[in-house]
């Protein structure tokens, strides 16, 4: 059986890669993917802790986080599509205002 510390280390690495990608990239789509990677790291942490503590609370909360992440991705991609249609770019350096 894989020890809990390995799951925690993997979740931390996933979260840190997501944070690094979110802070260093200027493409909004890559920033959304990095945000999803951070949420997946948190989900892995929740599921691992829940499994090792013999509780279903972490699993249930993870389902809610996955649902919210899917909604966030859909809304975020919708906004990115609208920005690309109006400004022809998805770099956040070139977008200074959200007014249409």
Curated annotation (Swiss-Prot):
The chain crosses the membrane at residues 2-22, 28-48, 64-84. GO terms for biological process: ATP synthesis coupled electron transport. The keyword Translocase applies. It comes from the Bacteria. GO terms for molecular function: NADH:ubiquinone reductase (non-electrogenic) activity; quinone binding. Keywords: Cell inner membrane, Cell membrane, Membrane, NAD, Quinone, Translocase, Transmembrane, Transmembrane helix, Transport, Ubiquinone. One of its GO terms (cellular component) is plasma membrane. Pfam families: Oxidored_q2. Disulfide bonds: none annotated. It catalyses: a quinone + NADH + 5 H(+)(in) = a quinol + NAD(+) + 4 H(+)(out). Its EC number is 7.1.1.-. InterPro entries: NADH_UbQ_OxRdtase_chain4L/K, NUOK/Mnh_C1-like. The keyword Amino-acid biosynthesis does not apply. NDH-1 shuttles electrons from NADH, via FMN and iron-sulfur (Fe-S) centers, to quinones in the respiratory chain. The immediate electron acceptor for the enzyme in this species is believed to be ubiquinone. Couples the redox reaction to proton translocation (for every two electrons transferred, four hydrogen ions are translocated across the cytoplasmic membrane), and thus conserves the redox energy in a proton gradient. NCBIfam families: PRK05715.1-2, PRK05715.1-3, PRK05715.1-5. Belongs to the complex I subunit 4L family. NDH-1 is composed of 14 different subunits. Subunits NuoA, H, J, K, L, M, N constitute the membrane sector of the complex. This is NADH-quinone oxidoreductase subunit K. It comes from Desulfovibrio desulfuricans (strain ATCC 27774 / DSM 6949 / MB). The lineage of its organism: Bacteria, Pseudomonadati, Thermodesulfobacteriota, Desulfovibrionia, Desulfovibrionales.
């Amino acid at each position: 059986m894989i020890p809990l510390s390995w799951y925690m280390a993997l979740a931390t690495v996933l979260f840190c890669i997501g944070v690094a990608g979110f802070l260093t990239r200027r493409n909004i789509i890559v920033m959304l993917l990095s945000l999803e990677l951070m949420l997946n790291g948190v989900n892995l942490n929740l599921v691992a802790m829940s499994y090792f503590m013999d509780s279903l609370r972490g699993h249930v909360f993870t389902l809610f986080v996955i649902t919210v992440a899917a909604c966030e991705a859909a809304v975020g991609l919708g906004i990115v599509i609208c920005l690309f249609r109006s400004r022809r770019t998805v770099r956040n350096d070139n977008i200074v205002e959200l007014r249409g």
